[in-house]
């Protein structure tokens, strides 16, 4: 899948403003309204994996003799447009903007409140 995306002529990687470890809220889909921490970002597909959200069950057959099969639950990816950064202090969602501070360091902040993230 990733190789086929890279081979396309006009393929461009989408910049993601959400990073691993951010707290996000789902704004669209069956899990709408739930919040969780981003475990993994997949920039080439513009997707994120959020802890405890969009769970899928996977049935695993026994591989060795004497072993029993299992049912695993794991998080599936969500499209990045379906999640939004969530601020615990202000209890609201907001878009993220980049800015350069006085020392010349690039940082992120919330557009609604101006709260600096990192």
Swiss-Prot record:
GO MF annotations, alphabetized: rRNA binding; structural constituent of ribosome
Record has Transferase as a keyword: no
CDD domains from the UniProt entry: KOW_RPL26
Domain of life: Bacteria
Keyword Transcription part of the UniProt annotation: no
GO terms (BP aspect): translation
Pfam families reported for this sequence: KOW, ribosomal_L24
Cellular component terms (Gene Ontology): ribonucleoprotein complex; ribosome
Keywords: Ribonucleoprotein, Ribosomal protein, RNA-binding, rRNA-binding
InterPro entries in the cross-refs: KOW, Rib_uL2_dom2, Ribosomal_uL24, Ribosomal_uL24_CS, Ribosomal_uL24_KOW, Translation_prot_SH3-like_sf
Described purpose of this protein according to its UniProt entry: One of two assembly initiator proteins, it binds directly to the 5'-end of the 23S rRNA, where it nucleates assembly of the 50S subunit. One of the proteins that surrounds the polypeptide exit tunnel on the outside of the subunit.
Subunit record text: Part of the 50S ribosomal subunit.
Family, similarity comment: Belongs to the universal ribosomal protein uL24 family.
Annotated protein name in UniProt: Large ribosomal subunit protein uL24
């Amino acid at each position: 899948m990733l190789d086929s995306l890279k081979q396309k002529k006009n393929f461009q990687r989408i910049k993601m403003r959400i990073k691993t470890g951010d707290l996000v809220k789902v704004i669209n889909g069956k899990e709408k309204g739930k919040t969780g921490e981003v475990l993994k970002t997949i920039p080439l597909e513009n997707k994120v994996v959020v802890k405890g959200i969009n769970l899928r069950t996977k049935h695993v057959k026994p591989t060795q003799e004497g072993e029993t099969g299992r049912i695993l639950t794991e998080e599936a990816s969500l499209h990045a447009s379906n999640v939004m950064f969530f601020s615990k202090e202000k209890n609201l969602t907001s878009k993220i903007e980049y800015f350069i501070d006085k020392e010349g360091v690039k940082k992120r902040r919330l557009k609604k409140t101006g709260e600096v993230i990192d």
